[in-house]
């Protein structure tokens, strides 16, 4: 994630130029009672099947998740993270298909939900099936909406922002970086909207009511904070580098302003593939532009679906300067470095987040000079 505050900290190590602070809504600092502790170590997830039905107009969504998990120590309860979610059902699916209903206890202060069963659960593999509803917020944490004006009226787009601990606002999950699992996401969306996630769309089926059921491919193992979902009146342009489909996604009508960002991504991906000796592992890498600004961050490195505020990504060719281009290039280099530092290789806990940011900032600085000499950094 590109943050102005973290950039200040990294400056002392790498003497990088600090991105200017930009203003507008983002997540508010958590109160002390909201700061969570680590989850019990008795269970770990291996796969999430997630189904979402967003209602953008009502700022709410319905969700279902079936979590494949491993019970490591016999237990009578399972605790995971959940925030601002209301559960309607919970059951554990045993081998052979038998189900055990669960008693649900939500701790709002600790942002957890505990599911207790009437009999001990032995070590082994199970599935936890949960039905729930949640809130679409207006600040950049969890699943949130952004409203904007168009010549045909006001529109609303949805995006997600999960770092550091807000995946729990969209999916009940083991929302800690050490818990990596695969994800299969499906979403019911208006047929006129584009849906974007970490993986390419595997199928899109028009339903009887005119909406579309969009299913995305299964992700590689990753931490929950790297999951992404966006939906709106978008358009997309693509290019190919080393077998990877690079994409830029914008609000309809703004795609030409993303041309430089796409070209920058082509240069950076080709260079990183060569430098690291480990090719970018996902089939596609989008950069999704969103309206608005934040004083807390400018972009986020979701694996396969980078999120960037428009002010940090889009350029009007008629008025943009060399400095503007260097800023767009710099942010692309930073967030794409995170696809290796942070996404492919992830810290176990948040106290080592500085490693993600430090390595990404180092690569951002190291690979700017060959392409934009004015942007040299001392490293």
Locations of the language-model features?
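Gram-negative bacterial Sec-dependent N-terminal signal peptides
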Residues: 1-23
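N-terminal, polar/Ser/Thr-rich
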Residues: 4, 23-62, 96, 152-157, ...
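Glycine/proline-rich low-complexity spacer/linker segments in large multi-domain proteins
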Residues: 30-40, 122, 129-184, 232-240
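Beta-strand elements of well-folded, non-transmembrane domains
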Residues: 54-56, 67-73, 134-136, 189-191
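Ligand-binding face of N-terminal immunoglobulin V-set domains in extracellular IgSF glycoproteins
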Residues: 61-84
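Hydrophobic helix-coil surface modules that form long, contiguous segments used
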Residues: 63, 161-165, 172-333, 361-362, ...
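A surface-exposed beta-strand-loop module
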Residues: 84-150, 172-175, 209
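Catalytic Zn2+-binding segment of zinc metalloproteases
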Residues: 336-351
């Amino acid at each position: 994630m590109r943050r102005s505050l973290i950039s200040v900290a990294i400056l002392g190590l790498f003497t990088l130029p600090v991105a200017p602070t930009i203003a507008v809504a983002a997540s508010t600092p958590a109160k002390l009672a909201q700061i969570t502790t680590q989850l019990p170590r008795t269970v770990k997830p291996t796969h999430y099947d997630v189904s979402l039905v967003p209602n953008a107009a009502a700022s709410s969504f319905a969700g279902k998740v079936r979590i494949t998990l491993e019970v490591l120590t016999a237990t009578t309860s399972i605790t995971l993270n959940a925030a601002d979610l209301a559960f309607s059902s919970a059951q554990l699916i045993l081998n052979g298909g038998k189900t055990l209903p669960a008693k649900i206890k939500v701790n709002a202060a600790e942002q957890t939900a505990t599911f207790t069963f009437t009999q001990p659960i032995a070590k082994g593999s199970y599935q936890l099936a949960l039905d729930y509803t949640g809130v679409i917020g207006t600040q950049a944490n969890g699943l949130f909406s952004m409203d904007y004006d168009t010549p045909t009226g006001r529109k609303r787009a949805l995006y997600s922002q999960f770092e550091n601990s807000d995946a729990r606002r969209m999916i009940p999950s083991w929302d800690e970086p050490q818990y990596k699992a695969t994800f299969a996401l499906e979403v019911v969306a208006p047929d006129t909207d584009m849906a974007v996630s970490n993986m390419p769309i595997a199928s899109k089926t028009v339903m009887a009511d005119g909406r579309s059921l969009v299913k995305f491919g299964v992700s590689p193992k990753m931490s929950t904070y790297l999951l992404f979902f966006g939906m709106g009146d978008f358009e997309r342009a693509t290019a190919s580098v080393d077998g990877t489909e690079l994409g830029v996604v914008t609000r309809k009508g703004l795609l030409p302003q993303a041309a430089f960002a796409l070209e920058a991504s082509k240069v950076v991906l080709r260079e990183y593939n060569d430098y690291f000796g480990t090719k970018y592992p996902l089939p596609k890498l989008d950069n999704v532009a969103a309206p608005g600004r934040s004083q807390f961050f400018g972009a986020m490195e979701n694996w396969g679906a980078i999120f960037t505020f428009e002010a940090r990504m889009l350029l009007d060719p008629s008025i943009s300067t060399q400095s503007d281009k260097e800023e767009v290039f710099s942010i692309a280099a930073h967030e794409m470095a995170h696809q290796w530092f942070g996404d492919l290789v992830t810290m176990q806990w948040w106290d080592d987040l500085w490693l993600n940011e430090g390595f990404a900032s180092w690569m951002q600085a190291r690979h700017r000079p060959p392409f934009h000499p004015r942007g040299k950094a001392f490293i």
